[in-house]
Amino acid sequence: DQHDMIKDILNLHNNGLPFELDTTFSIGNFYQKNGKAIIEEPLYKFDMYPQIDGVQKLTFPLPFCDNSIQSIMFDPPFVISKGDSLNNGNSRSNIISKRFSSYESPLDLFISYDTNLKEYYRILKNDGILVFKCQGTVSSGKNFFIPEWVMWRAYHIGFYPLDRFELIARSRLISGKVKT
């Protein structure tokens, strides 16, 4: 599962230490399983929409000096959605985008990801690590191969993509528009 994968990444590439910074902390469920802490929380916690005490509002530039952070976890939204279905009152539609957030267009997603990558490159130490949790997505019937784009873009910003982990989904949320 994702928790085991993250623990493996931390052990392999961060000497078993916790992340120093998470800019997509939300309420910290990522660090828990069934209400039990299984991954140590980061020292610095940020989110676009802080929901709990101890989480700071994400603004750019981040309040860190250049080359000052050892490790970053980034688990951004991946859903591209807009329109009436976001506010139609149906609790079974747009589950992910309602729980976290979404981008209105593919361009918005790419701009956001690019902005974050550049800022992380600025604040990460030379031997620091960025864990960018992402997945491909579909919008308006078009596939967007996000992990491949992130690797390409990170490389062009100056990162060295050291590793890639893939978690295979056992199930998928399917749009209500799809008839099976």
Give the predicted meaning of each segment.
Residues 1-180:
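Class I S-adenosyl-L-methionine-dependent methyltransferase catalytic core
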